[in-house]
Regions:
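Structural motif
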Residues: 3, 296, 319-328, 366-369, ...
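Core structural elements
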Residues: 191-204, 255, 292-314, 325-342, ...
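Strongly charged, low-complexity linkers/loops
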Residues: 347-358, 362, 371-441
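Basic, nucleic-acid-interacting segments
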Residues: 1-282, 299, 320-324, 334
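M16/insulysin-pitrilysin zinc metalloprotease superfamily fold
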Residues: 321-322, 328, 336-350, 359-364, ...
Length: 462
C-alpha cells in the first residue's frame, strides 16, 4: 500500500508600516524618492549614531496583533541579527527574537473552494528593513539605494497550518485586508510593502514530525507565491518565473543574535493596550455584515465591495452623499469592475471622487440623463474624474423631455417605417422595439426610453 503525503506550509510575511518616518530615525519613508535621498547617519549605520524608537511602529504592531487575536507582550526587547550583505550598512539588522511584541494568535480563512479553518500566528515582531540592491547589467555592477534602509516592518510568522497554495492565498488575502483596514500599511505587493517567505515541507499524512523545511524568499505577488509553492529551498525570480539556489535556511544561531545595547525594552501598560483596542476600526468581516443588514445588499455584493478598503470607502462616501446604496453598489459592481478589468487596474487604484459618482446617480434618478448616456459619463468620471453635471452640459447629453419634440420625431419614424407599424398593429408586439430603437437613434440617445415607449403606444393606438 502506497504512503500518502501532505504538504505543510508556513509563512513569514513582511509588511512595511505606513509611518511617515523610519523606525529608528526621522528620515522619510515615502516610496519613489531619488536614490539615497531619504537617509541619515542612523539608517546608514554610521559610527556613533544612536536609534530612537518610533512610537507609531509599536502602536501599529499592537493593532495588527489585536486584530489577529494575539497576546501582547507587555515587556518586549530588540535584538541584533548579524549578517553581512551590501544592502545592510550596519552589518546587523535590529529585530526581535527573544521577546517579540505579539505571540500566539490566529486568523480564520475561507478558500475559494469553501474550506474554512484557523491559521495560527506564532508571533509578530518589529524590525527594520534593509536597503535595496539595483543591478545594472550594462555597467556590470550593483548599486545600493539606502532609502529603504530603516523603513519599519512587522514580520508576521504563521504556524505551519496551511496545506495548499489555495490556503496560502486565502491567508495572505486575510492579512492584507486586516492590515489595510487598520491603516497600518497599504500592502502594495508591487511596491514591496508586503512580501512573503514561504516555508514548505512534506510529511506522511497523520505524522506529527515535520519533514525537512525548504524556503522560498523574495516573493511579492500572489501569483508568484502560488507558483513558488511548487519549488524548493531557493530564491524565487519573478521575472524568469523560476527559482535559483540561494543560501540554505538559517537557524537563529547562524545570525548570532544578542540584545541591542542601544535600545531600552518596550514596556506596554494595560491602559495602552486598552486604548489601542478601543481605537480599532471596523474590519472587513464586520463591515460586510453591516452592508447586508443596513443596506440590504446581497452577500456577494457585500463581499466584493469590502474586498478592497478603498472600494468600500468609495461606496460608503457615495451612499452618504446620495442616499442610494443599491444604485451605488450597482455602479461599482458592474461598471467600475468592468473598467478596472479593461485597464488592468486594482480597485485600490481608483482615483475618482465619490462626490462625482453620487452626483451621477442623482442625475439619473432625476431623469436628467438616461442610463445609457450615464455609462458614457461614468467612463469619463472613472478615467478623468470629471464633474458629471459640467460634462453633460458641455456635451449636450441632457435627456430631451419636451413631449412635443419627441412626438414630432416619433411621427417621422412611424411615417418612415410603415411595415413595422403594420406588424405591430397586426399583433407583433416586438415590432415596437425596433421603433423605439429608431427613435432613440434619431434623438442621438438623448430621449427617455420610457417616455418614447409611452408616446409610441399612444400614437400607434390612434
Amino acid at each position: 500500500m502506497s504512503k500518502q503525503y501532505e504538504t505543510v506550509i508556513g509563512l513569514e510575511v513582511h509588511v512595511e508600516l505606513a509611518t511617515k518616518t523610519k523606525i529608528f530615525c526621522g528620515c522619510s519613508t515615502a516610496f519613489g524618492g531619488a536614490p539615497n535621498t531619504h537617509t541619515c547617519p542612523v539608517c546608514t549605520g554610521m559610527p556613533g549614531s544612536l536609534p530612537v524608537l518610533n512610537k507609531q511602529v509599536v502602536e501599529y504592531a499592537m493593532a495588527v496583533g489585536l486584530a489577529a487575536n494575539c497576546q501582547i507582550n507587555q515587556y518586549c526587547k530588540f535584538d541584533r541579527k548579524n549578517y553581512f550583505y551590501p544592502d545592510n550598512p550596519q552589518n546587523y539588522q535590529i529585530s526581535q527574537l527573544y521577546l517579540p511584541i505579539c505571540h500566539d494568535g490566529w486568523v480564520e480563512i475561507e478558500t475559494e473552494s469553501g474550506i474554512k479553518k484557523k491559521v495560527g500566528i506564532h508571533e509578530i515582531h518589529m524590525e527594520e528593513d534593509a536597503g535595496k540592491l539595483v543591478h545594472d547589467e550594462w555597467e556590470d555592477c550593483s548599486l545600493v539605494d539606502y532609502n529603504r534602509s530603516g523603513v519599519p516592518l512587522i514580520e508576521i510568522v504563521s504556524e505551519p497550518d496551511m496545506r495548499s497554495a489555495e490556503e496560502v492565498i486565502a491567508y495572505l488575502e486575510k492579512l492584507r485586508l486586516i492590515i489595510q483596514y487598520l491603516g497600518a500599511s497599504d500592502c502594495k505587493l508591487q511596491e514591496g510593502s508586503m512580501r512573503a517567505d514561504v516555508n514548505i515541507s512534506v510529511r506522511e499524512v497523520g505524522a506529527s514530525e515535520f519533514g525537512t523545511r525548504t524556503e522560498m524568499k523574495n516573493i511579492n505577488s500572489f501569483k508568484a507565491i502560488a507558483h513558488a509553492i511548487e519549488g524548493e529551498t531557493r530564491r524565487w525570480d519573478d521575472n524568469k518565473e523560476s527559482s535559483k539556489a540561494m543560501r540554505s535556511k538559517e537557524d537563529a544561531q547562524d545570525y548570532r543574535y544578542f540584545p541591542d545595547p542601544d535600545l531600552t525594552p518596550v514596556v506596554i501598560s494595560d491602559e495602552w493596550i486598552a486604548r489601542i483596542r478601543a481605537a480599532q476600526p471596523e474590519l472587513r468581516t464586520e463591515k460586510m455584515v453591516r452592508y447586508i443588514s443596513e443596506f440590504d445588499l446581497p452577500q456577494y455584493d457585500a463581499q466584493i465591495l469590502t474586498n478592497s478598503k478603498h472600494m468600500a470607502d468609495v461606496f460608503e462616501e457615495t451612499v452618504k452623499l446620495c442616499g442610494k446604496p443599491k444604485e451605488a453598489s450597482n455602479w461599482l459592481m458592474v461598471e467600475a469592475m468592468r473598467l478596472l478589468k479593461e485597464h488592468e487596474m486594482d480597485p485600490d487604484d481608483m482615483g475618482f471622487s465619490p462626490a462625482n459618482l453620487a452626483k451621477l446617480i442623482q442625475m439619473v434618478a432625476a431623469g436628467e440623463i438616461n442610463r445609457t448616456m450615464a455609462k458614457t459619463v461614468f467612463e469619463e468620471i472613472f478615467e478623468h474624474n470629471v464633474d458629471p453635471a459640467v460634462y453633460v452640459e458641455e456635451k449636450g447629453l441632457k435627456v430631451v423631455n419636451d413631449e412635443g419634440a419627441l412626438k414630432a420625431t416619433i411621427e417621422g419614424i412611424l411615417a418612415a417605417n410603415p411595415q413595422s407599424v403594420a406588424d405591430y398593429k397586426g399583433g407583433k408586439e416586438k415590432a415596437i422595439g425596433f421603433l423605439v430603437g429608431q427613435t432613440m437613434k434619431a434623438m442621438k440617445g438623448k430621449a427617455d426610453p420610457g417616455m418614447v415607449n409611452k408616446l409610441l403606444k399612444e400614437l400607434l393606438a390612434k
